[in-house]
């Protein structure tokens, strides 16, 4: 006769099986904002950024900083997490093209092409020197970034954690290798362990089925806007999201 592994829940919002492998966590969401992904969106508003700095922003920078600003009060300090599957791929492609032509790459272009460029621009724009994290994990970038954000929120219950995930379609030269996302998007999620108004339980189980990046964002947004349990089949795991008001 087989027995199911017992689950242990702690105040950290994490559930563990008896073999100590984490397989679920509560995401303590207090606010969120999305740009793109089929949601009616105007041009990303970044008027809060100094004009000199604003001129350096790429379209992805603008959308990422826009959704972040919507979720925050003026002069509010947060632990920032920026996640992107491709990052500033358009800038990187331009730099590689310059190098291939034997031209010196632009120092400014290089400094803005790295994955942590958005956190850096955010810190400058809002004069916030709080810790920042940058994550890129292939197709599972958004799902794994949620775990990182929730973990930081539970580890620092008095702090505000802000997750920004943004991407744009890869340049045509990469079409043979990757096509997603097909449209630019940005989503910001504010997490607060003590002030969550929309706690979501995230559960993952081993699976082999690659899902599209658009599907994971749509699936999570559906969970936030409805009472339904949603799921996404990632490259190595099946992810489930469900509201869990028992954690408030």
Which ranges hold each PLM region?
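Active-site-proximal alpha-helical scaffold in enzymes
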Residues: 65-68, 136-159
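Conserved "HGTGT" condensation-loop signature of ketosynthase/thiolase-family condensing enzymes
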Residues: 1-140, 165-248
């Amino acid at each position: 006769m087989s027995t199911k592994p017992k689950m242990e829940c702690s105040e950290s919002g994490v559930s563990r099986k008896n073999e100590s492998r984490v397989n679920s966590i509560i995401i303590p969401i207090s606010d969120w904002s999305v740009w793109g992904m089929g949601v009616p969106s105007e041009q990303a508003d970044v008027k809060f950024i100094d004009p000199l700095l604003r001129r350096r922003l790429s379209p992805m920078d603008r959308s990422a900083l826009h959704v972040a600003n919507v979720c925050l009060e003026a002069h509010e300090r947060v632990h920032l997490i920026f996640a992107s599957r491709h990052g500033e791929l358009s800038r990187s492609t331009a730099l590689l093209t310059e190098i291939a032509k034997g031209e010196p790459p632009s120092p400014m272009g290089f400094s803005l092409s790295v994955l942590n460029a958005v956190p850096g621009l955010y810190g400058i724009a809002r004069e916030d020197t709080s810790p920042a994290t940058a994550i890129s994990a292939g197709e599972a970038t958004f799902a794994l970034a949620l775990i990182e954000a929730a973990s930081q929120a539970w580890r620092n219950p008095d702090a505000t954690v802000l997750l920004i995930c943004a991407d744009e379609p890869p340049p045509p030269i990469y079409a043979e290798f990757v096509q997603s996302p097909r449209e630019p998007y940005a989503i910001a999620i504010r997490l607060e362990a003590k002030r969550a108004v929309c706690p979501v339980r995230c559960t993952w189980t081993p699976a082999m089925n690659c899902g599209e990046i658009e599907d994971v964002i749509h699936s999570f947004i559906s969970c936030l806007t409805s009472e339904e349990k949603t799921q996404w089949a990632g490259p190595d795991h099946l992810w489930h999201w469900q509201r869990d008001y028992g954690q408030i």
